Curated annotation (Swiss-Prot):
GO cellular component, one term: eukaryotic 48S preinitiation complex
Subunit structure: Component of the eukaryotic translation initiation factor 3 (eIF-3) complex.
Role: Component of the eukaryotic translation initiation factor 3 (eIF-3) complex, which is involved in protein synthesis of a specialized repertoire of mRNAs and, together with other initiation factors, stimulates binding of mRNA and methionyl-tRNAi to the 40S ribosome. The eIF-3 complex specifically targets and initiates translation of a subset of mRNAs involved in cell proliferation.
Cellular compartments annotated: Cytoplasm
Gene (name only): TIF34
Gene3D superfamilies given in the database record: YVTN repeat-like/Quinoprotein amine dehydrogenase (2.130.10.10)
Disulfide bonds: none
Alphabetic keyword roster: Cytoplasm, Initiation factor, Protein biosynthesis, Repeat, WD repeat
Name of this chain's protein: Eukaryotic translation initiation factor 3 subunit I
Keyword Acetylation: no
InterPro entries the UniProt entry points to: eIF3i (IPR027525), WD40/YVTN_repeat-like_dom_sf (IPR015943), WD40_repeat_CS (IPR019775), WD40_repeat_dom_sf (IPR036322), WD40_rpt (IPR001680)
Family: Belongs to the eIF-3 subunit I family.
GO biological process: formation of cytoplasmic translation initiation complex
Amino acid sequence: MRPILLQGHERSLNQIRFNHDGDLLFSVAKDKILCAWYSANGERLGTYHGHQGALWTVDVSPGTVLLATGAADNTVRLWNAKSGECVKVWDFPTAVKRVEFSPDGSRLLAVTEKRMGYLGTIVVFDVRYGDGEGNNLDDQTDEPSLKITCEQSKATVAGWSFLGKYIIAGHEDGSVSQYDSKTGEQLQNVQAHEFDYQINDLQFSADRTYFITASKDKSAKIISCRDLQVMKTFVADTPLNTAAITPKKDFVILGGGQAAMDVTTTSARQGKFEARFYHKIFEDEIGRVRGHFGPLNTIAVHPAGTGYASGGEDGYVRVHHFDKPYFDFMYEVEREKARR
């Protein structure tokens, strides 16, 4: 499995996303640039310029019509994915750490930072698509349709459950919350990870009925959207920055490594900078992929399950297309079931 190395950023990666077809990959880093790439061959399609601070997050609407980014310049920007023009800027009092479109693309959530006397919030905007042909995209609302304020512990990550029914948020204190996406009312809060170990990433399954969290407490957990019950726990030996669920095969991919500030001039192996594959059902580690020279900050899996991409503190995105042995790999019990 030879990776394609994408060199488009000068500073560490913060998030990468495939579009829904999986043919494009979007990456954001601390160097203010959003890059678009072809995922098949790693060719750079273009860049989107306009932000004045480190980019923390990116998401792409279901039809790849709009892109949303959140940054340290306290704005969320909406982009025309095709032309690269910025069609809307929403301003906030603090930095924006996570954006995500709802499954139908009609709404966009943004998670804002707790700072300078402002509490962390989750805001939701209604998104309009002009005439559907990519025109009039700049006709957007100015005010959010919903605002959730995190009184206790600030939200670090958030996303939409199946059918956009709930907003699921991961918090700085290691807990996970479920909010009603229409009223903003908190329905449940569960201490999923060790107290005060923040949740760094939260990614959903293909059908959005469950999700995986990655935490500083060196574990990742699969949790049900409906009742926030912890279904599986994957234990690693290093703090985790990111975790993703693979379609097609029952695996999860975890990424992390020693915190960037703790890294000394040791070998890449000692820093534990590998992508780890675990079996989703049996919770065993089944393999690792090396390559990054620094912690892994973000992992995204191709929506068809044919490959994955990882972005690291080293400023590189590595795109991997899975080989035949990956798809052939089975546990004995799975093989027996297939034979029946």
